[in-house]
Amino acid sequence: MSKKTFLTERQKTVLEMRERGWSQKKIARELKTTRQNVSAIERKAMENIEKSRNTLDFVKFLKSPVRILCRRGDTLDEIIKRLLEESNKEGIHVIHDSITLAFLIREKASHRIVHRVVKSDFEIGVTRDGEIIVDLNS
């Protein structure tokens, strides 16, 4: 496993112990600190992990050969149709079926889609591997 991460050694230790099923109280005793401190370390580690995931998604989106803009008023069905058509033009096989695509898009853009209709613009990218990246920063 790579040593270079965005996690401190203390965060790694706490996450490893939590993964083994240790309670925060037990970790605190072992590390000679408070349970509140263990909780704060774990919370900050999870924030760092989420930021890392967001960074990777951003880079994947930048490199996506297929990007479609989902505009206010577009329906989920229209978006999926355009997404699949544009992917086919690029020779990319999307790794999800239409039902799963609808679920993924609604899950990632839940506050921008109401009753299968886009309420505020966002973009979707498709990687060369057919992975879907929803970019809410547009």
From Swiss-Prot:
Biological process annotations from GO: DNA-templated transcription initiation
Transcription regulation among keywords: yes
Any Pfam family: TFX_C
Keyword DNA-binding: yes
Keyword vocabulary terms for this entry: Activator, DNA-binding, Transcription, Transcription regulation
InterPro entries: RNA_pol_sigma70_r4, Tfx_C, Tfx_DNA-bd_arc, Tfx_DNA-bd_euryarc, Tfx_DNA-bd_sf_arc
A GO term, aspect molecular function: DNA binding
Family that this chain belongs to: Belongs to the Tfx family.
Entry function: Transcriptional activator of the fmdECB operon.
Full protein name: DNA-binding protein Tfx
Species annotation: Methanothermobacter marburgensis (strain ATCC BAA-927 / DSM 2133 / JCM 14651 / NBRC 100331 / OCM 82 / Marburg) (Methanobacterium thermoautotrophicum)
